[in-house]
């Protein structure tokens, strides 16, 4: 895997953050590989790369597919890069078999999908009109790096306007980044959209006291309160089939072994593929927080930090992918994505679909991220048949 050698990290990991020297080398290698199979290459103002193979009918819009080459720090070899190299393989197959399609066909490498350096999905956000080129080019990373300057340094500051392309549909192949397909012994995930997400911060205020002198029944223990709230919210979700919850941050005061916790702040991440379910969960969780706080003699404050509604992909793209999986006799299921992808941006302006392939133990953003050759073949083959169908319709 020559691409994985660029930014190679310990334990088979890859560190190739957006607009780094390693990202530039990966872009160079992709360009070298793909030149024999395309007619045109374009780079837009924020570094999105487009490689176009013309169709037999030049007046028709192109079909686009791709993903991203940048990675998390000490991330894996398959996240993003699979979707790019899969399209390279599709283009190679069409070229070697002299297959001509009515619609033109293009590969896109979206600039800066990961959140390893800059804010995520900036390239696809500009393409879809969610951000302006100026906003992205002026962005600074946590280390102070300037997006526009870094883009010039690696040689990928283009001048094509994102709106200059006419696109019929967009498909993206990606590892699932979760354990569902592997757990159900399936080959392909036909992605229906992405889960909505709500984040909230919960603050619980109790009363500090001596760990040895205050009886249990007289305590206002903020940490005990938080523990019961989290357990109750988990129980609520376990009765459902369409949501997940994670408590990933927690601050405890005074954080002393011999002092009853007086204050706890914890962050919740709640996701569901259905807007009404997210709203219902918010109400159920808020009610649980209130009642359990009273039980523990604590006060509470709930702050909704963000809300992203669920994403729904295009029905016609979903049907094309499902039809391809059926024809190839692959085991598949329709499923939502638990993570955000460039496709979630692109769907705002173009009919969009996604294909998932299983990954070992559902692990991603980690050096142990892995998908077998057989799994990758089935994913790429499904993409090939789906794209071919879209380019003929």
Language model: regions and residue ranges:
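Alpha-helical metal-binding/catalytic segments enriched in His/Glu/Asp
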Residues: 65, 74-115, 198-204, 213-236, ...
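Active-site-adjacent substrate-binding region
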Residues: 5, 9, 144-192, 230-235, ...
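Zn-dependent metallopeptidase/amidohydrolase metal-coordination segment
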Residues: 2-9, 66-67, 262, 332-382, ...
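A short beta-alpha structural unit
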Residues: 18, 246-255, 267-274, 299-318, ...
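Catalytic-core environment of secreted peptidases
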Residues: 33, 37, 49-79, 87
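Midchain, well-structured core segments that form catalytic/ion-binding scaffolds
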Residues: 112-276
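Flexible, glycine/charged-enriched surface loops at secondary-structure junctions
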Residues: 44, 100-101, 158-162, 213, ...
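N-terminal capping segment at the start of a domain
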Residues: 1-20, 112, 308
């Amino acid at each position: 895997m020559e691409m994985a050698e660029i930014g190679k990290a310990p334990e088979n990991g890859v560190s190739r953050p957006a607009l780094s020297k390693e990202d530039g080398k990966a872009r160079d290698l992709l360009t070298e590989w793909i030149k024999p199979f395309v007619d045109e290459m374009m780079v837009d103002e924020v570094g999105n790369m487009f490689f176009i193979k013309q169709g037999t009918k030049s007046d028709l819009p192109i079909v686009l597919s791709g993903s991203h080459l940048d990675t998390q720090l000490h991330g894996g070899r398959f996240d993003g890069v699979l979707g790019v190299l899969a399209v390279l393989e599709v283009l190679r197959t069409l070229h070697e078999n002299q297959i001509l399609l009515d619609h033109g066909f293009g590969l896109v490498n979206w600039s800066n999908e990961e959140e390893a350096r800059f804010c995520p999905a900036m390239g696809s956000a500009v393409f879809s009109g969610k951000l302006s080129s100026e906003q992205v080019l002026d962005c600074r990373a946590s280390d102070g790096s300037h997006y526009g300057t870094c883009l010039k340094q690696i040689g990928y500051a283009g001048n094509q306007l994102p709106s200059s392309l006419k696109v019929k549909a967009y498909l993206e192949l990606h590892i699932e980044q979760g354990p569902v397909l592997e757990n159900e012994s399936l080959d392909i995930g036909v992605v229906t959209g992405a889960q909505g997400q709500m984040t909230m911060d919960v603050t619980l205020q109790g009363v500090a006291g001596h760990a040895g002198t205050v009886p249990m029944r007289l305590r206002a223990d903020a940490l005990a309160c938080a523990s019961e709230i989290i357990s109750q919210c988990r129980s609520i979700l376990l009765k459902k089939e369409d949501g997940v919850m994670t408590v990933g941050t927690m601050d405890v005061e005074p954080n002393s072994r011999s002092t009853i916790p007086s204050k706890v702040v914890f962050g919740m991440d709640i996701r569901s593929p259905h807007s009404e379910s997210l709203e219902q969960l918010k109400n159920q969780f808020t009610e649980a927080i209130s009642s359990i706080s009273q039980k523990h003699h604590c006060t509470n404050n709930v702050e909704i930090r963000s809300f992203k509604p669920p994403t729904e992909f295009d029905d016609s793209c979903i049907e094309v992918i499902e039809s391809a999986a059926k024809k190839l006799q692959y085991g598949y299921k329709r499923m939502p994505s638990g993570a955000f992808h460039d496709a979630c941006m692109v769907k705002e302006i173009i009919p969009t679909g996604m294909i998932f392939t299983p990954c070992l133990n559902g692990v991603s953003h980690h050096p142990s991220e892995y998908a077998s050759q057989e799994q990758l073949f089935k994913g790429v083959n499904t993409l090939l048949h789906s794209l071919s169908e879209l380019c003929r319709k």
